[in-house]
Amino acid sequence: MAKKGKKYQEAASKVDRTQHYSVEEAIKLAKETSIANFDASVEVAFRLGIDTRKNDQQIRGAVVLPNGTGKSQSVLVFAKGDKIAEAEAAGADYVGEAEYVQKIQQGWFDFDVVVATPDMMGEVGKLGRVLGPKGLMPNPKTGTVTMDVKKAVEEIKAGKVEYRAEKAGIVHASIGKVSFTDEQLIENFNTLQDVLAKAKPSSAKGTYFKSVAVTTTMGPGVKIDTASL
């Protein structure tokens, strides 16, 4: 494994790896130890006490963070009829039908989120092998397969983030940028944590929030005291 640079080592030395910090302390420390020369993202990782091999312990959804993520999301909407005008009025970057299926099949990916009306999923389904591995396939659980394209687009533009538990039960999500105030990041963190707490499967036993850490792009991880959640 490659050795981390001097700048990273200096930042990491400010974090006590044996200590678990409060949410407030962890966010402040993560910002202070950011070493990127750009406005880095602030990311959180929740390790949940779930078994993702069981169908009733799958966790996936989306939440609108009160302060957004600081990132502008480009939205592609698959729709037809009057839903095209509705999506455009809501601020969608690209709206169309089969022509966008063909563009994507040819390697076009100038978008961050895909929304589709249910009557377009027959066409969008052709892109499963392409969009699926990139996490871009529309899904009812995340509100991206819907007839209410206005609400879907507006929420994404307002700072909606999708979350999904990976094989080890880990949920990764961005809660903002280093330029955000501590209060904005804390509020976003609490919103996400609350949604995950409510999503706890009834069949999940033992400790639910096994570990939580916050980090910035390229920065060291800071552990959060799960007892404080």
From Swiss-Prot:
Checking InterPro entries in the record gives: Ribosom_uL1_bac-type, Ribosomal_uL1, Ribosomal_uL1-like, Ribosomal_uL1/biogenesis, Ribosomal_uL1_3-a/b-sand, Ribosomal_uL1_CS
Identify the Pfam families for this entry: Ribosomal_L1
Q: Which PROSITE patterns match?
A: RIBOSOMAL_L1
Q: Which GO terms describe its molecular function?
A: rRNA binding; structural constituent of ribosome; tRNA binding
SUPFAM superfamilies the record matches: Ribosomal protein L1 (SSF56808)
Quote a single Gene Ontology cellular component term: large ribosomal subunit
The superkingdom listed in its UniProt entry is Bacteria
Q: What keywords would UniProt list here?
A: Repressor, Ribonucleoprotein, Ribosomal protein, RNA-binding, rRNA-binding, Translation regulation, tRNA-binding
> Gene3D superfamilies given for it?
3.30.190.20, 3.40.50.790
Signal peptide (UniProt feature, chain positions): none
- One GO BP annotation of this record: regulation of translation
Entry-linked PANTHER family: 54S RIBOSOMAL PROTEIN L1, MITOCHONDRIAL, LARGE RIBOSOMAL SUBUNIT PROTEIN UL1M
Give the UniProt family note. Belongs to the universal ribosomal protein uL1 family.
Q: How does it assemble?
A: Part of the 50S ribosomal subunit.
Reported function: Binds directly to 23S rRNA. The L1 stalk is quite mobile in the ribosome, and is involved in E site tRNA release.
Q: What is this protein called?
A: Large ribosomal subunit protein uL1
Species name: Staphylococcus aureus (strain MRSA252)
Lineage of producing organism: Bacteria, Bacillati, Bacillota, Bacilli, Bacillales
The gene that this protein is the product of is rplA
